């Protein structure tokens, strides 16, 4: 009986992690890919126009802390001239944003 309970707990935890990962990918595809690309390279028409960073580049990833990425997603991002280039993700929870940051980290090569 104990083995069945442990198995059920592990299975539930694994399912929750899988759901979180797929939610992050879905959020990326819906909210981020238009500029940053499905592959994170930022080479979409909009991404090139706005100067989106290449998240597959290890040096770009190293220069961006999780905290800075979280803040940019939560509050939006302005360029050096003060022009909004990324709107805040108002409909995402903090957990959703953390998931997006973690998903963005998977692009690093």
Language model feature labels by segment:
Residues 39-41, 59:
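Short, well-ordered turn and helix-capping elements at secondary-structure junctions
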Residues 1-4:
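Positively charged n-region of N-terminal signal peptides that target proteins for export
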């Amino acid at each position: 009986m104990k083995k069945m309970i442990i198995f059920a707990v592990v299975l539930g935890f694994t399912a929750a992690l899988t759901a979180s990962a797929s939610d992050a990918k879905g959020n990326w595809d819906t909210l981020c890919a238009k500029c940053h690309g499905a592959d994170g390279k930022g080479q979409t028409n909009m991404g090139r126009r706005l100067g989106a960073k290449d998240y597959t580049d290890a040096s770009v990833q190293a220069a961006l802390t999780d905290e800075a990425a979280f803040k940019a997603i939560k509050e939006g991002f302005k360029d050096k001239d003060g022009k909004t280039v990324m709107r805040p993700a108002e409909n995402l929870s903090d957990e959703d944003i953390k998931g997006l940051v973690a998903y963005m980290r998977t692009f690093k090569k």
